[in-house]
Amino acid sequence: MKKIAMLTAAMMMLGASSVLAAPINQMAEPETAVGVGTKESYIEHKITNKATIGYQYADRDEYGDHKDAYLQYDVVGSEVKLIGGYRWTDGKDNAFGGVALSTPRVMGFDAYASYVAGKDFNETQVGINKNLLLNVDLNANYHNFKPDHGHHENGVGAGITVKF
């Protein structure tokens, strides 16, 4: 199973993408996205044609929950983004930074990948979004969460995003 997930992740990265635990969304100003996934929920809003602010709540198997406030800044179109934010957990709060890449939408699909790191963790996610309706996307992803102390958490997830 791990080999299949890693092969899928590598193929999607060759297609060129990156992300935070919430999927990377391509939005227009002033669009808002609300999403629910296997272990997370989030809301984000495109405040300018280059900047998106967001808030995410995620439930970790071993480490309790964490809450993220973040900013994504489009560097090259909406395909390359810089990410910065702050994560609140049970006792280990962290500033973090990273990068996200996403592919242009083709036949209703766009792929993405991201990497973020803080003082006590790093996290990678690769995934694909499929447009189901005009403003509803289905998301499938693989994530790898590595705290500096403790066990790694990785797995496959799915979610729904509504944009308005």
Language model regions located:
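Outer-membrane beta-barrel proteins
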Residues: 2-164
